[in-house]
Amino acid sequence: MKRVNAILRHPLFAEKLRLLDTLEAERAFCRHDLTHLLDVARLMWIDVLERGLEIDRDVVYAAALLHDLGRAEQMQSGIPHEDAGAMLAERILPDAGFSAEETDAVIAAIRCHRGSAPADAREMLGEILYRADKASRTCWRCGARGACNWPEERKNAGIAR
């Protein structure tokens, strides 16, 4: 997990996560803090193991850690967070020791994690990220559930596969 720790220690990652924590400090809805990012990473890794997929653990964690990092940029300038996150990943991942191929895979996953799960098998990492991101939310115990703009059918009623 040397490369994952390099992401966590990267100055740009730390700066954007601190900014996001500040911007979301009063947010009533789901936050995009380190706890969320690690929840997504762990759910992704469980999915990879259960399905017997051959995806490097560092790549899984990189996608999870970076997938919402662009939210601060979205809140400040309106740039979609998946686009801002992809740009941040382009800067952080090479510094953390990820290859060009790994970086491209993580960027593709970040770019597609907001829409519907991709059907293309080449986008497996994006599909896993999409599912884990949605599954990570504890809607059933959220105090702001009634005010949330997610449709009821998208809100998690409990822990599910």
Please report, for each region that a protein language model flagged, where it lies by residue:
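Metal-dependent phosphohydrolase cores
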Residues: M1-R161
